[in-house]
Regions:
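Extracellular glycan-recognition surfaces and repeat-rich motifs
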Residues: 33, 39-82, 208
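Extra-cytoplasmic beta-strand recognition segments
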Residues: 40, 84-111, 140-144, 169-170, ...
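Beta-strand acidic-aromatic groove motif in beta-rich domains, primarily in extracellular
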Residues: 48-52, 85-87, 109-120, 151-155
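Extracellular carbohydrate recognition
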Residues: 84-85, 158-174
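Extracellular carbohydrate recognition and processing domains
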Residues: 121-150, 160
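Aromatic-rich peripheral "rim/lid" segments of glycoside hydrolase catalytic domains that contact
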Residues: 194-197, 402, 421-455, 459-467, ...
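Glycoside hydrolase catalytic-domain groove-lining segments
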Residues: 209-210, 344, 350, 363-439, ...
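Active-site cleft segment of glycoside hydrolase catalytic domains centered on the general acid/base Glu
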Residues: 235-238, 265-378, 391-400, 406, ...
């Protein structure tokens, strides 16, 4: 990557403003061994306490109404003044073990808190926040390990006047969920440190940024590799050196091959200068040799790559013009050369194909349908998803789910990010620097950045059949350091990304790193 209704009804009961939601009674008259009325269809619209459910707090703010996800009705939370309400159901007589709650939700955003949790299950309460999605329904999951034969399903809102949520089609079944990749791209790190970049933990103590990220929960690092860039960075040499640091922290490694001397993305896929003028047949050999050389060197030093991207954001192909999607048979040959080189070094290394189409269902289908038809070999699907460019969270979930199901492959977010503030640290304009460019419901604050990452991770976690692997944050360490700009041919260029790093303008680790601890 680089740069470039809710219907209103009269309240049924007076609101008891300000009641806390933490003193839920230990049990209720609604105890059952299976979830009752998870689709809110039993009572119809206008019911203050749907069958099977109980309420606590400002109870008039919780009610059923028309406009369900799968049926005719849904549960809604809304009030014309600030409110706190919990809609819950107590389950007893459960067989101990792993369970998963699935729910379809919508939210207008703006609440102090809006989440679904599983609690009183014998262990730590598990929560999933409701992503902001004012129109499309989003599926979320909440996993729990029941150890005391009971569990409480809890739908919570701590909201300001006019805030709303919709919830529908809840199921509570055996199973579990979670993601295995809590990662970040740190390709900028080597040059940053060479140019004087400093990184601190949240207390302000200078330290190794790889260790700081690891301590926050990061478990996978992504490094890009260029062939012969003008500034000498992001080469095999830097990848080998940084890989040692990554593996020393017990993290896994993804190597992202651009097959270029410069950034590759949907708008540019230039061949390396050393490969200029090569025939298509020679380019296939170039791809194989370059891929094998870098990966074999990593293996030789004990830092074998765990995953490899053959190409970066290859919407239009790679190694233009020979590898353009205008000539799919040639693109397939190049991609398969990369795949074969990866497997020749280590058969266990997973090979990913990466598109910048995280919210583009039709585009993702078209591309991968062509890849499959041409016999392209791959193990994993990676998608870039930046909410300010690539569509809504609903679009994102629809695309991700479809890719996993249609091709039977695991999926992951290869790149995403979000600003923690507006306004550049240096004199260079940032990529996202206006409030009008933000995703609705997600402010440019540390809290907004944290919420964005957790909500993206929740959507990946909810991919059916456990095919959602996780998320990579893009360029967590790209702070504003003179000389470490986006253009390797221009030392005066800024990076335009420092307001989306995971280290602040004071070089301290941001609280938003907490997203690495997402399930």
């Amino acid at each position: 990557m680089f740069h470039p209704r809710r219907t209103i009804k009269a309240l049924l009961l007076p609101l008891a403003a300000g009641l806390a939601l933490t003193s839920l009674p230990a049990q209720t008259a609604q105890a059952a061994s299976t979830l009752t009325n998870g689709g809110f269809e039993t009572d119809g619209a206008g019911t203050g306490t749907p069958s099977g459910w109980s309420e606590y707090g400002d109870t008039g703010a919780s009610f059923s109404e028309s406009g369900g996800h799968g049926g005719s009705y849904r549960l809604s939370h809304w009030a014309s003044s600030a409110y706190k309400v919990e809609t819950y159901q107590y389950l007893s007589g459960l067989t101990n073990g792993n369970y998963k709650l699935t729910a379809w939700v919508r939210s207008g955003g703006g609440q102090n808190a809006a989440y679904i949790s599983l609690k009183n299950c014998g262990g730590t309460e598990q929560r999933t926040n409701l992503p902001v999605s004012a129109s499309g329904w989003i599926r979320i999951v909440v996993p729990v390990n029941v150890t005391n034969n009971q569990c409480t399903i809890s739908i919570n809102s701590d909201a300001n006047a006019g805030n709303w949520i919709n919830v529908d089609d809840l199921t509570f079944t055996s199973g579990t969920s979670g993601t295995s990749i809590h990662g970040a791209d740190i390709s900028s790190l080597a040059k940053s440190e060479a140019k004087g970049g400093v990184y601190r933990n949240s207390s302000g103590t200078t330290g190794d940024p790889v260790a700081v990220l690891k301590s926050a929960g990061m478990n996978y690092a992504r490094l890009k590799v260029w062939v012969n860039p003008a500034d000498g960075y992001n080469t095999k040499t830097q990848v080998l050196a940084t890989a040692k640091r990554i593996k020393a922290q017990g993290m896994k490694l993804l190597v992202d091959f651009h097959y270029s001397d410069f950034w590759t993305d949907p708008g540019q896929q230039a061949k390396p200068s050393a490969w200029s003028g090569h025939s298509y047949s020679q380019l296939k050999t170039d791809v194989y040799n370059h891929t094998y050389d870098v990966l074999n060197a990593l293996k030789a030093q004990g830092t074998t790559a765990d995953m490899v991207q053959v190409g970066n954001e290859i919407n239009g192909g790679m190694l233009w013009n020979e590898g353009s999607t205008a000539n799919w048979s040639q693109l397939a040959g190049l991609l398969n050369s990369g795949y074969d080189a990866v497997k020749a070094v280590n058969s266990s290394t997973q090979v990913a194909l990466h598109l910048a189409k995280g919210g583009d269902l039709a585009g993702t289908r078209s591309w991968f349908d062509s890849a499959v038809a041409q016999g392209v070999k791959f193990d994993v699907i990676g998608l870039s998803y930046y909410g300010y460019w690539h569509g809504s969270l609903y679009d994102f979930q629809t695309t991700l789910d479809d890719a996993a199901a249609r091709y039977g492959k695991p999926v992951y977010v290869a790149e995403t990010a979000y600003p923690f503030r507006l306004g550049s640290e240096d004199s260079h304009e940032d990529v996202i620097d206006l409030s009008s460019e933000l995703v609705s419901g997600y402010p440019a604050t540390v809290a907004g950045q944290t919420r964005w990452m957790n909500d993206v991770a929740s959507i990946v976690e909810a991919v059916p059949n456990g095919r959602g692997l996780g998320v990579f944050y893009w360029e967590a360490t790209w702070t504003a350091v003179t000389g470490n700009g986006w253009d390797p041919t221009d030392a005066s260029s800024g990076n335009a990304w420092e307001n989306q790093a995971l280290f602040g303008y004071d070089d301290r680790a941001l609280a938003s790193m907490s997203w690495f601890s997402h399930r």
